[in-house]
């Protein structure tokens, strides 16, 4: 039985899906104006692991993670780069996909983009105005926070406790509002900015409305799980709840999950401290699987500290697990012992996806395997556990097999059977083997 720590109730709750054997998850994705940093990677890896464990236990998972491709930061970065916002966002969406693939993150069921939902966003805002939850002011549209019952319940705050500047508001914006806490649903466009026509003039969506619309359009008025980084709890997720529930009159999400922060050498990551690390740069020197394994060593809600030592430790531990998988199979293993490992693993992961405890079970099992208990059922169970963490080792092609295929290719070439020769080259290439035809014969290397 899976239990989830729900940020809304500040408690551990049994997971009960809206639809039996199916879980709908929406996770806030990146604002695509730069390469993602290790903090973004933590969110991607954490929720990918959660998704994988749901699948491990037999759930069908609809996993939605958006790309915010309409935002002030994108407009500013695009202007500085001399390209359109779409060109910039396309570039960094491709980079995000490449980086997260290197981290072993499975593709989402859907990756909606804000630009594809402008009409739906306008319709959503119109509905809020009709219900008197929103108002237009000089081409902008704002949400009436005071009309939202229990506003900021997710952040466990009251209206009086909230700071006026929590969303980075300017004096000009505040002057247009009925209440300084009201937030923008639609922003009027400045000259030359990307914009769309609307009943309130040309403009673009506010940040918070984007996720509400994409989540409800794809998954319905109520979703099982909404997730993201702890920094999104307020104001982003708080405002999503307010506007979504104002429109539908229904609970927006049944469970709210937030992953913890990443520190670098026990300091908050920031550009001013010079410890801001992008995944793109890190992957030049650190294997993606090592980075992923490091991110799994702490339970998703807890902070995790990035250091050279923690990465080195992750690399050593991964090698140990890989060597364990390559042990020769044995004829027998204690089936009851195997069953106990599986139960212990599930108990750990059922407890709010406690990867730290789950990994402890994996290493205990590896020790047992290395003592001489490694049948096919044991190997299968072990591989399935590792796959929950996104750890999937490709079996290396043995040298004897490579040489045999090269000999077969040479024979085909001698017989002028170039189709077979090319097919063998392609087969080896897929397996990471590159052939070099030299005057001294064929050389090969692992790509």
UniProtKB/Swiss-Prot annotation:
GO terms for molecular function: ATP binding; cysteine-tRNA ligase activity; zinc ion binding. It comes from the Bacteria. Its main location: cytoplasm. SUPFAM superfamilies: Anticodon-binding domain of a subclass of class I aminoacyl-tRNA synthetases (SSF47323), Nucleotidylyl transferase (SSF52374). Its cofactor is Zn(2+). Binds 1 zinc ion per subunit. Keywords: Aminoacyl-tRNA synthetase, ATP-binding, Cytoplasm, Ligase, Metal-binding, Nucleotide-binding, Protein biosynthesis, Zinc. It is found in: Cytoplasm. Gene3D superfamilies: Anticodon-binding domain of a subclass of class I aminoacyl-tRNA synthetases, HUPs. The keyword Nucleotide-binding applies. It holds the Pfam family tRNA-synt_1e. SMART domains: DALR_2 (SM00840). ATP binds at residue 271. One of its GO terms (cellular component) is cytosol. GO terms for biological process: cysteinyl-tRNA aminoacylation. A motif ('HIGH' region) lies at residues 30-40. A motif ('KMSKS' region) lies at residues 268-272. It catalyses: tRNA(Cys) + L-cysteine + ATP = L-cysteinyl-tRNA(Cys) + AMP + diphosphate. Its EC number is 6.1.1.16. Zn(2+) binds at residues 28, 211, 236, 240. Monomer. Belongs to the class-I aminoacyl-tRNA synthetase family. This is Cysteine--tRNA ligase.
């Amino acid at each position: 039985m899976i239990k989830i720590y729900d940020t809304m109730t500040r408690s551990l709750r049994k997971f009960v899906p809206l639809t039996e054997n199916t879980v709908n998850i929406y996770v806030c994705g990146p604002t695509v104006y730069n390469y993602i940093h290790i903090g973004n990677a933590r969110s991607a890896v954490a929720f990918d692991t959660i998704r994988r464990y749901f699948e491990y236990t037999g759930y069908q998972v609809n996993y939605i993670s958006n790309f915010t491709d309409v935002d002030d930061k994108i407009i500013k970065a695009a202007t500085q780069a001399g390209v359109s916002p779409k060109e910039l966002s396309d570039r960094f969406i491709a980079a995000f996909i490449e980086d997260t693939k290197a981290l072993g993150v499975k593709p989402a069921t859907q990756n909606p983009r804000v630009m594809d939902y402008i009409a739906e966003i306008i319709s959503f805002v119109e509905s809020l105005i009709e219900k008197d939850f929103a108002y237009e002011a000089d081409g902008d549209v704002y949400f009436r926070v005071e009309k939202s019952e229990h506003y900021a319940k997710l952040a466990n705050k009251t209206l009086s406790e909230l700071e006026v500047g929590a969303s980075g508001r300017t004096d000009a914006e505040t002057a247009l509002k009925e209440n300084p806490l009201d937030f923008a649903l639609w922003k009027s466009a400045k000259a030359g900015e990307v914009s769309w026509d609307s009943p309130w003039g040309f403009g673009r969506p506010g940040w918070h409305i984007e996720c509400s619309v994409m989540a409800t359009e794809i998954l319905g008025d109520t979703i099982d799980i909404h997730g993201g980084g702890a920094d999104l709890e307020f104001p982003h997720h708080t405002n999503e709840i307010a506007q979504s529930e104002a429109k539908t009159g229904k609970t927006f999400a049944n469970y709210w999950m937030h992953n913890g922060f990443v520190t670098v050498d026990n300091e908050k990551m920031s550009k001013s401290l010079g410890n801001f690390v992008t995944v793109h740069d890190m992957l030049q020197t650190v294997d993606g699987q090592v980075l992923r394994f490091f991110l799994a060593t702490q339970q998703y809600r807890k902070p995790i500290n990035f250091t050279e030592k923690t990465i080195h430790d992750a690399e050593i531990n991964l090698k140990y697990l890989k060597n364990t998988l390559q042990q020769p199979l044995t004829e027998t293993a204690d089936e009851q012992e195997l069953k106990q490992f599986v139960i212990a693993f599930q108990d750990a992961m059922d407890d709010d996806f406690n990867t730290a405890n789950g990994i402890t079970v994996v290493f205990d099992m590896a020790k047992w395997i290395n003592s001489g208990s490694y049948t096919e059922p044991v190997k299968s169970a072990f591989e399935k556990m590792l796959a929950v963490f996104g750890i999937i080792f490709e079996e290396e092609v043995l040298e004897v097999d490579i040489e045999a295929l090269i000999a077969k290719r040479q024979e085909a070439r001698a017989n002028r059977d170039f189709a077979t020769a090319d097919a063998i080259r392609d087969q080896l290439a897929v397996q990471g083997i590159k052939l070099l035809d030299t005057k001294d014969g064929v050389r090969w290397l692992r790509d």
